[in-house]
Amino acid sequence: QRIGTSDPAEVERFVRGELEAKRPVFGFGHAVLRTEDPRASAQFALGEEICPDDEYFRIIRVLREIAPMVLSENPKISNPNANVDIASGTLLNFVGLQDAEYYTTFFGWARVAGIGAQIVDERTVMRGGKGIPIYRPKYIAEEQTLRHLE
């Protein structure tokens, strides 16, 4: 909402202004990943299906292209790529959840579901119930057997 337009020149001006004011450009960077967050990619694919002409979605689509180029000019920024935060609010707004004050709570409960699933998995199957560190579902540990939930 703060950008207000999907014009690439205005989006670039916004990003540069945020950096000059020493404010973060939300929706970019990740502590572990060095490429675009796959969740952000999935959200953009969903946005292209359900709201490609929505003005907010057009803005973040341009932001996704412009911001990494501007952010990568700073040698202190090791990952200028989009993360999961870039599109989530826009998509929630489009489907009707327009009060942004609920977004943090909504995201928190989404994490609870993932953490809960991991705890159940590690306590009932992994390493005889001894538990394991956080793992990424995309990857399969060498000692982990392939299995599917029915």
Can you annotate each of these PLM segments?
Residues 1-150:
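Non-transmembrane, aqueous-exposed alpha-helical and coiled segments at domain scale
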